[in-house]
Protein backbone atom coordinates (compact mmCIF):
# COMPACT_ATOMS: atom_id res chain seq x y z
CA UNK A 1 0.00 0.00 0.00
CA UNK A 2 1.29 3.43 -0.85
CA UNK A 3 1.95 5.54 2.21
CA UNK A 4 -0.77 7.94 1.24
CA UNK A 5 -1.78 10.75 3.50
CA UNK A 6 -5.12 12.34 2.76
CA UNK A 7 -5.80 12.01 -0.94
CA UNK A 8 -8.56 13.96 -2.65
CA UNK A 9 -9.53 13.09 -6.21
CA UNK A 10 -9.79 16.14 -8.46
CA UNK A 11 -13.32 17.42 -8.76
CA UNK A 12 -14.76 15.30 -5.94
CA UNK A 13 -15.21 15.59 -2.21
CA UNK A 14 -14.17 12.01 -1.53
CA UNK A 15 -11.05 11.33 0.51
CA UNK A 16 -9.02 8.12 0.71
CA UNK A 17 -7.56 6.78 3.96
CA UNK A 18 -5.23 3.80 4.52
CA UNK A 19 -6.25 0.81 6.65
CA UNK A 20 -3.05 -1.23 7.10
CA UNK A 21 -2.89 -4.94 7.81
CA UNK A 22 -1.09 -6.40 10.82
CA UNK A 23 0.75 -9.50 11.89
CA UNK A 24 0.94 -11.15 15.29
CA UNK A 25 4.62 -11.97 15.65
CA UNK A 26 3.71 -14.38 18.45
CA UNK A 27 0.55 -15.11 20.42
CA UNK A 28 -0.05 -16.97 23.65
CA UNK A 29 -3.04 -17.37 25.95
CA UNK A 30 -2.30 -16.91 29.64
CA UNK A 31 -5.72 -17.40 31.24
CA UNK A 32 -9.31 -16.28 31.26
CA UNK A 33 -11.16 -13.40 32.90
CA UNK A 34 -14.20 -13.89 35.11
CA UNK A 35 -16.42 -12.78 32.20
CA UNK A 36 -15.07 -15.59 30.01
CA UNK A 37 -12.78 -13.53 27.78
CA UNK A 38 -9.36 -15.06 27.27
CA UNK A 39 -6.22 -13.21 28.35
CA UNK A 40 -3.39 -13.14 25.85
CA UNK A 41 -0.01 -11.72 25.06
CA UNK A 42 1.10 -10.81 21.56
CA UNK A 43 3.13 -8.38 19.49
CA UNK A 44 1.29 -6.44 16.80
CA UNK A 45 3.34 -5.58 13.72
CA UNK A 46 1.77 -3.06 11.35
CA UNK A 47 2.38 -3.46 7.62
CA UNK A 48 2.75 -1.09 4.67
CA UNK A 49 -0.08 -2.88 2.85
CA UNK A 50 -3.82 -3.08 3.38
CA UNK A 51 -7.24 -1.73 2.48
CA UNK A 52 -8.25 1.78 1.47
CA UNK A 53 -11.31 3.50 2.95
CA UNK A 54 -13.00 6.15 0.80
CA UNK A 55 -15.17 8.66 2.67
CA UNK A 56 -17.50 11.48 1.72
CA UNK A 57 -19.16 13.64 4.36
CA UNK A 58 -22.94 14.06 4.22
CA UNK A 59 -24.86 16.90 5.83
CA UNK A 60 -28.03 14.89 6.49
CA UNK A 61 -26.59 12.55 9.13
CA UNK A 62 -27.03 9.37 7.10
CA UNK A 63 -24.33 6.67 7.23
CA UNK A 64 -24.31 4.80 3.93
CA UNK A 65 -22.18 1.99 2.51
CA UNK A 66 -21.34 2.33 -1.17
CA UNK A 67 -20.76 -1.07 -2.74
CA UNK A 68 -20.27 -4.32 -0.85
CA UNK A 69 -16.85 -4.61 0.79
CA UNK A 70 -17.51 -8.09 2.15
CA UNK A 71 -19.92 -10.27 0.15
CA UNK A 72 -22.68 -11.63 2.34
CA UNK A 73 -22.17 -9.12 5.19
CA UNK A 74 -25.28 -7.02 5.79
CA UNK A 75 -24.76 -3.27 5.99
CA UNK A 76 -25.84 -3.12 9.64
CA UNK A 77 -23.27 -5.80 10.51
CA UNK A 78 -20.40 -4.22 8.58
CA UNK A 79 -17.72 -2.97 10.99
CA UNK A 80 -17.15 0.23 9.02
CA UNK A 81 -20.83 1.15 9.30
CA UNK A 82 -20.93 0.20 12.97
CA UNK A 83 -17.81 2.29 13.62
CA UNK A 84 -19.27 5.35 11.93
CA UNK A 85 -22.57 5.05 13.79
CA UNK A 86 -20.82 4.48 17.10
CA UNK A 87 -18.69 7.60 16.65
CA UNK A 88 -21.67 9.63 15.51
CA UNK A 89 -23.68 8.58 18.57
CA UNK A 90 -20.86 8.98 21.09
CA UNK A 91 -19.91 12.46 19.85
CA UNK A 92 -23.42 13.67 19.06
CA UNK A 93 -22.28 14.43 15.52
CA UNK A 94 -24.85 15.84 13.13
CA UNK A 95 -22.94 14.95 9.98
CA UNK A 96 -23.08 11.64 8.17
CA UNK A 97 -20.88 9.86 5.66
CA UNK A 98 -20.75 7.63 2.62
CA UNK A 99 -18.20 4.82 2.93
CA UNK A 100 -16.59 2.68 0.26
CA UNK A 101 -13.92 0.06 0.97
CA UNK A 102 -11.28 -1.17 -1.46
CA UNK A 103 -10.49 -4.59 0.02
CA UNK A 104 -7.07 -6.16 -0.30
CA UNK A 105 -6.74 -7.83 3.10
CA UNK A 106 -8.24 -11.36 3.05
CA UNK A 107 -11.24 -11.76 5.32
CA UNK A 108 -10.82 -14.17 8.20
CA UNK A 109 -7.07 -14.53 7.74
CA UNK A 110 -5.82 -12.98 10.98
CA UNK A 111 -4.41 -9.96 9.13
CA UNK A 112 -6.76 -7.54 10.91
CA UNK A 113 -8.72 -6.26 7.94
CA UNK A 114 -12.07 -5.67 9.60
CA UNK A 115 -10.54 -4.12 12.72
CA UNK A 116 -8.24 -1.87 10.71
CA UNK A 117 -11.10 -0.71 8.50
CA UNK A 118 -13.14 0.18 11.60
CA UNK A 119 -10.22 2.05 13.17
CA UNK A 120 -9.64 4.04 10.00
CA UNK A 121 -13.29 5.08 9.93
CA UNK A 122 -13.07 6.26 13.56
CA UNK A 123 -9.87 8.23 13.01
CA UNK A 124 -10.87 9.65 9.63
CA UNK A 125 -14.39 10.73 10.55
CA UNK A 126 -13.11 12.23 13.80
CA UNK A 127 -11.00 14.49 11.57
CA UNK A 128 -13.51 15.05 8.77
CA UNK A 129 -16.35 15.82 11.17
CA UNK A 130 -14.10 18.14 13.21
CA UNK A 131 -14.79 16.29 16.46
CA UNK A 132 -11.30 16.54 18.00
CA UNK A 133 -11.77 13.42 20.14
CA UNK A 134 -8.54 12.13 21.66
CA UNK A 135 -6.81 8.92 20.62
CA UNK A 136 -7.69 7.49 24.05
CA UNK A 137 -11.38 8.14 23.45
CA UNK A 138 -11.26 6.68 19.95
CA UNK A 139 -9.44 3.60 21.26
CA UNK A 140 -12.12 3.12 23.93
CA UNK A 141 -14.81 3.31 21.26
CA UNK A 142 -12.82 0.93 19.09
CA UNK A 143 -12.66 -1.65 21.86
CA UNK A 144 -16.46 -1.85 21.71
CA UNK A 145 -16.08 -3.03 18.11
CA UNK A 146 -13.24 -5.51 18.60
CA UNK A 147 -10.15 -6.20 20.70
CA UNK A 148 -7.78 -5.44 17.79
CA UNK A 149 -9.28 -2.07 16.88
CA UNK A 150 -7.34 0.01 19.48
CA UNK A 151 -3.91 -0.91 18.11
CA UNK A 152 -4.94 0.37 14.68
CA UNK A 153 -6.36 3.56 16.20
CA UNK A 154 -3.07 4.24 17.98
CA UNK A 155 -1.06 3.29 14.92
CA UNK A 156 2.07 1.92 16.60
CA UNK A 157 3.68 -1.50 16.75
CA UNK A 158 2.88 -2.78 20.19
CA UNK A 159 3.24 -5.42 22.87
CA UNK A 160 -0.34 -6.30 23.85
CA UNK A 161 -1.86 -7.92 26.92
CA UNK A 162 -5.29 -8.32 28.49
CA UNK A 163 -7.72 -9.21 25.71
CA UNK A 164 -5.35 -7.36 23.40
CA UNK A 165 -6.25 -3.82 24.43
CA UNK A 166 -3.41 -3.14 26.91
CA UNK A 167 -0.80 -1.73 24.55
CA UNK A 168 2.84 -0.85 25.07
CA UNK A 169 4.57 0.70 22.03
CA UNK A 170 7.54 -1.36 20.91
CA UNK A 171 10.31 -0.62 18.42
CA UNK A 172 10.77 -3.32 15.80
CA UNK A 173 13.57 -3.68 13.25
CA UNK A 174 12.92 -3.23 9.56
CA UNK A 175 11.70 -6.45 7.99
CA UNK A 176 9.88 -7.83 4.98
CA UNK A 177 7.23 -10.53 5.08
CA UNK A 178 6.00 -13.21 2.74
CA UNK A 179 2.28 -13.63 3.40
CA UNK A 180 0.09 -16.53 2.31
CA UNK A 181 -3.68 -16.84 2.60
CA UNK A 182 -4.65 -20.56 2.74
CA UNK A 183 -8.21 -19.62 1.82
CA UNK A 184 -9.95 -21.25 4.78
CA UNK A 185 -11.58 -19.63 7.79
CA UNK A 186 -12.38 -21.17 11.15
CA UNK A 187 -14.31 -18.85 13.50
CA UNK A 188 -12.21 -17.83 16.49
CA UNK A 189 -14.83 -19.04 19.03
CA UNK A 190 -14.57 -22.53 17.51
CA UNK A 191 -10.80 -22.51 18.00
CA UNK A 192 -11.13 -21.27 21.57
CA UNK A 193 -13.36 -24.28 22.34
CA UNK A 194 -10.73 -26.72 21.10
CA UNK A 195 -9.42 -29.09 23.76
CA UNK A 196 -6.00 -28.92 22.06
CA UNK A 197 -5.60 -25.18 22.66
CA UNK A 198 -3.04 -24.19 25.31
CA UNK A 199 -4.74 -21.65 27.58
CA UNK A 200 -2.34 -21.46 30.53
CA UNK A 201 0.98 -20.28 29.12
CA UNK A 202 3.32 -18.66 31.63
CA UNK A 203 3.18 -14.86 31.29
CA UNK A 204 6.14 -13.50 29.34
CA UNK A 205 7.91 -10.15 29.30
CA UNK A 206 8.89 -7.86 26.46
CA UNK A 207 12.51 -8.85 27.07
CA UNK A 208 11.57 -12.47 26.30
CA UNK A 209 10.29 -11.38 22.91
CA UNK A 210 13.34 -9.20 22.28
CA UNK A 211 15.60 -12.19 22.95
CA UNK A 212 13.91 -14.12 20.15
CA UNK A 213 12.47 -16.80 22.43
CA UNK A 214 8.82 -16.01 21.61
CA UNK A 215 7.75 -17.05 18.12
CA UNK A 216 4.90 -19.51 18.65
CA UNK A 217 1.19 -18.94 18.13
CA UNK A 218 -1.17 -20.91 20.38
CA UNK A 219 -3.61 -21.45 17.52
CA UNK A 220 -1.04 -22.91 15.12
CA UNK A 221 -1.09 -26.58 16.22
CA UNK A 222 -4.88 -26.55 16.42
CA UNK A 223 -5.31 -25.14 12.92
CA UNK A 224 -2.63 -27.30 11.34
CA UNK A 225 -4.32 -30.45 12.62
CA UNK A 226 -7.80 -29.23 11.74
CA UNK A 227 -7.23 -27.71 8.29
CA UNK A 228 -5.21 -29.55 5.61
CA UNK A 229 -4.88 -26.32 3.61
CA UNK A 230 -3.09 -24.62 6.50
CA UNK A 231 -0.77 -27.59 6.97
CA UNK A 232 0.02 -27.56 3.25
CA UNK A 233 0.96 -23.86 3.40
CA UNK A 234 3.21 -24.48 6.40
CA UNK A 235 4.94 -27.28 4.53
CA UNK A 236 5.47 -25.06 1.47
CA UNK A 237 6.75 -22.12 3.52
CA UNK A 238 9.09 -24.32 5.56
CA UNK A 239 11.17 -24.73 2.40
CA UNK A 240 11.99 -21.01 2.37
CA UNK A 241 12.04 -20.07 6.05
CA UNK A 242 10.28 -20.43 9.40
CA UNK A 243 6.51 -20.15 8.89
CA UNK A 244 4.25 -18.64 11.52
CA UNK A 245 0.53 -18.04 11.97
CA UNK A 246 -0.99 -14.60 12.48
CA UNK A 247 -3.91 -14.00 14.82
CA UNK A 248 -6.21 -16.99 15.09
CA UNK A 249 -5.40 -17.78 11.45
CA UNK A 250 -5.50 -18.88 8.89
CA UNK A 251 -3.00 -16.43 7.42
CA UNK A 252 0.65 -17.54 7.45
CA UNK A 253 3.90 -15.64 7.05
CA UNK A 254 7.68 -15.82 7.00
CA UNK A 255 9.89 -12.93 8.09
CA UNK A 256 12.92 -11.80 6.06
CA UNK A 257 15.54 -9.13 6.62
CA UNK A 258 15.00 -7.60 3.18
CA UNK A 259 12.30 -7.33 0.55
CA UNK A 260 14.64 -8.86 -2.02
CA UNK A 261 14.99 -11.99 0.11
CA UNK A 262 11.21 -12.22 0.51
CA UNK A 263 10.69 -11.80 -3.24
CA UNK A 264 13.22 -14.55 -3.90
CA UNK A 265 11.32 -16.85 -1.54
CA UNK A 266 8.01 -15.99 -3.19
CA UNK A 267 9.43 -17.09 -6.53
CA UNK A 268 10.06 -20.55 -5.06
CA UNK A 269 6.47 -21.11 -3.94
CA UNK A 270 3.83 -22.93 -6.01
CA UNK A 271 2.02 -20.50 -8.28
CA UNK A 272 -1.32 -21.73 -6.95
CA UNK A 273 -0.77 -20.08 -3.56
CA UNK A 274 -2.28 -16.66 -2.86
CA UNK A 275 0.80 -14.83 -1.63
CA UNK A 276 2.21 -11.31 -1.22
CA UNK A 277 5.44 -9.65 -0.21
CA UNK A 278 5.01 -6.66 2.11
CA UNK A 279 7.14 -4.68 4.52
CA UNK A 280 6.75 -3.82 8.17
CA UNK A 281 5.86 -0.22 9.00
CA UNK A 282 7.47 1.86 11.74
CA UNK A 283 4.05 3.43 12.28
CA UNK A 284 0.67 3.34 10.60
CA UNK A 285 0.22 5.40 7.42
CA UNK A 286 -3.15 6.31 8.93
CA UNK A 287 -1.29 8.62 11.34
CA UNK A 288 0.24 10.44 8.37
CA UNK A 289 -3.22 10.88 6.84
CA UNK A 290 -4.63 12.16 10.12
CA UNK A 291 -1.77 14.61 10.60
CA UNK A 292 -2.17 15.92 7.05
CA UNK A 293 -5.64 17.13 8.06
CA UNK A 294 -4.05 19.37 10.69
CA UNK A 295 -1.79 21.20 8.26
Curated annotation (Swiss-Prot):
This is 4-diphosphocytidyl-2-C-methyl-D-erythritol kinase. GO terms for biological process: isopentenyl diphosphate biosynthetic process, methylerythritol 4-phosphate pathway; terpenoid biosynthetic process. Gene3D superfamilies: 3.30.230.10, GHMP kinase, C-terminal domain (3.30.70.890). Keywords: ATP-binding, Isoprene biosynthesis, Kinase, Nucleotide-binding, Transferase. ATP binds at residues 106-116. It comes from the Bacteria. The keyword Cell inner membrane does not apply. NCBIfam families: ispE. Belongs to the GHMP kinase family. IspE subfamily. Its EC number is 2.7.1.148. It comes from Xanthomonas oryzae pv. oryzae (strain KACC10331 / KXO85). It catalyses: 4-CDP-2-C-methyl-D-erythritol + ATP = 4-CDP-2-C-methyl-D-erythritol 2-phosphate + ADP + H(+). The active site is at residues 22, 148. The keyword ATP-binding applies. Pathway: Isoprenoid biosynthesis; isopentenyl diphosphate biosynthesis via DXP pathway; isopentenyl diphosphate from 1-deoxy-D-xylulose 5-phosphate: step 3/6. It is an enzyme of class 2 (transferase). One of its GO terms (molecular function) is ATP binding. It holds the Pfam family GHMP_kinases_N. PANTHER family: 4-DIPHOSPHOCYTIDYL-2-C-METHYL-D-ERYTHRITOL KINASE, CHLOROPLASTIC (PTHR43527:SF2).
Amino acid sequence: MDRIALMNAPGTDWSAWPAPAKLNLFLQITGRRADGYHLLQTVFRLLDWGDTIHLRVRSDGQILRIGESLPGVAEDDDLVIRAARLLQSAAGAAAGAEIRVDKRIPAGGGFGGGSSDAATVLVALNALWGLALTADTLAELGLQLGADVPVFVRGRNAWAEGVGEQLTPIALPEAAYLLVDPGVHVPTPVLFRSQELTRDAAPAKITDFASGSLLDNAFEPVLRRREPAVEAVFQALSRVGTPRLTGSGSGCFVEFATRAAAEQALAQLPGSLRAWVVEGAAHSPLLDARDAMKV
